Amino acid sequence: HTLSDANPLTNQWAAEEFFRSVSGALGDADNVIYEICNEPNGSTSWADIKAYAEAVIPIIRANDPDAVIVVGTPTWSQDLAAAAADPLPDANVMYALHFYAATHEDDLRHALSTAVAGGLPVFVTEFGICEASGAGEIDYASANLWVRLMNELDVSYICWNLSNKDETAALFKPGCAKTSGFTLDDLTDEGLW
């Protein structure tokens, strides 16, 4: 699934082939988390995503029965309420939330709190401390509120993005070409945070 597809059902056959291959190759590894349906958008509904997940998850489970599988949620992985209202029956599934601290504030934090309080297992598989575009200003106050909340709720999170792209969300400065031996001078403001 790519963002330009908007709906994961568009190329579901390709996702099935991909996850069959990847889970076949990595099924014995105990450190692999599968994220299916990255940032569904446009008019994609939870029913669309759920149908996709119900087709793809058994393919992964055939090769990796105990793996954690994270499923994207509608509206760029932000509509946890839709997933909470009709969750998948699989016991080892989590639901993705993506946010950018300078864009997504109290409303989305409340949605996360509500979903977790209701028992929905959530993994923040992408966040940044800048605007949702990956550019713009950093909002340290909102970012700190987000991290405090995720820690209080025991929600795992991953910061986007580990690159040297010329944008606010990148953790490394554009001129950094290293693959190891990083110093603080190699980091952007988001990387230093």
Each language-model region and where it sits:
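Extracellular glycoside hydrolase catalytic/binding regions
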Residues: 11-33, 37-165, 169-193
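Aromatic-lined carbohydrate-binding surfaces of glycoside hydrolases
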Residues: 1-8
